[in-house]
Swiss-Prot record:
CDD domains noted in UniProt: MPN_RPN11_CSN5
Protein name: COP9 signalosome complex subunit 5
Native species: Xenopus laevis (African clawed frog)
One Pfam assignment: JAB
Sequence ranges assigned to domain MPN in this UniProt record: 53-190
Lineage, uppermost ranks: Eukaryota, Metazoa, Chordata, Craniata, Vertebrata
């Protein structure tokens, strides 16, 4: 189907999907090599050892679809994969039966039993990869680690190394048309990382800024890339043949109406806060640092405003294009 292939190609280009020529090259599991890596534990000598994270197209789709199914509630799952030098390779993922809220996910005993049974059954059918990380969603508030996430990941790295934490924002994924995903690893307690300069800017809601700021120096982000093999291509074609119509029949303006409204309210609160600080600063003398902080907050609010506006314009443009294509066919 032509429409299906175009939609699939657009999605792959948006997310810089790379194709691996040889299936064996990426799927071959060298047990001896993995055991040698686990025995050497190079990550204990360098707290910034892992720098890259590769995610298979199939694992990516499974995680995004699971995150989207949770709506405004956080969801959680586990990832299977392996290590290749400084790269953590995520081959597959599966959802966990956990209780989710709008701010956290809680794994109960049943989830741990399910996790152990799934990994054991996967090995019986030839999937020899071990658990390499966990993922959860942040619907509408970006990809970063909260205080609870940092504690969970520290515990995982202490007892289940090598382990990576992946965060997906399904709401921003729909709004921007590109997968919003981040992979992170935490530093050991007491470790002070060197100043790495400003990281890539992302919009953080006002009610999450404090939690983000307190813990942002306790972990670092890995460079994420996506790949697919010829086997993945077959599976993706089956998925796209089922879901590609949703691209034409849905609108991000309608699907994410609540999210967009929330963004506008959040922006309003940030501007009011900045205005109040500037007002107080005008009565104080010699407080240049205070002025710089206020200006910095205004600059961030401006960037947030631009991002929200651009996403709304893109949604409107897609609706106009679809209207021109399907509703205004000229008759000759």
């Amino acid at each position: 189907m032509a429409g299906s292939s175009v939609a699939q190609k657009t999605w792959e280009l948006s997310n810089n999907m790379q194709e691996v020529q040889s299936i064996d090259e990426i799927y071959k599991y060298d047990k001896k090599q993995q055991q040698e890596i686990l025995a050497a534990k190079p990550w204990t000598k360098d707290h910034h050892y892992f720098k890259y994270c590769k995610v298979s197209a199939l694992a990516l789709l499974k995680m995004v679809m699971h995150a989207r199914s949770g709506g405004n509630l956080e969801v959680m799952g586990l990832m299977l994969g392996k290590v290749d030098g400084e790269t953590m390779i995520i081959m597959d993922s599966f959802a966990l039966p956990v209780e989710g809220t709008e701010t956290r996910v809680n794994a109960q005993a049943a989830a741990y039993e399910y996790m152990a049974a799934y990994i054991e059954n996967a090995k019986q059918v030839g999937r020899l990869e071990n658990a390499i990380g966990w993922y959860h969603s942040h619907p509408g508030y970006g990809c970063w680690l909260s205080g609870i996430d940092v504690s969970t990941q520290m515990l995982n790295q202490q007892f289940q190394e090598p382990f990576v934490a992946v965060v997906i924002d399904p709401t921003r994924t729909i709004s921007a048309g590109k997968v919003n995903l981040g992979a992170f690893r935490t530093y050991p307690k007491g470790y002070k990382p060197p100043d790495e300069g400003p990281s890539e800017y992302q919009t953080i809601p006002l009610n999450k800024i404090e939690d983000f700021g307190v813990h942002c120096k306790q972990y670092y982000a890995l460079e994420v890339t996506y790949f697919k093999s010829s086997l993945d291509r077959k599976l993706l074609e089956l998925l796209w043949n089922k879901y590609w119509v949703n691209t034409l029949s849905s609108s991000s303006l309608l699907t994410n109406a609540e999210y967009t409204t929330g963004q506008v309210f959040d922006l309003s609160e940030k501007l009011e806060q900045s205005e109040a600080q500037l007002g107080r600063g005008s009565f104080m003398l010699g407080l240049e640092s205070h002025d710089r902080k206020s200006e910095d907050k205004l600059a961030k609010a401006t960037r947030d405003s631009c991002k929200t506006t651009i996403e709304a314009i893109h949604g409107l443009m897609s609706q106009v294009i679809k209207d021109k294509l399907f509703n205004q066919i000229n008759t000759f």
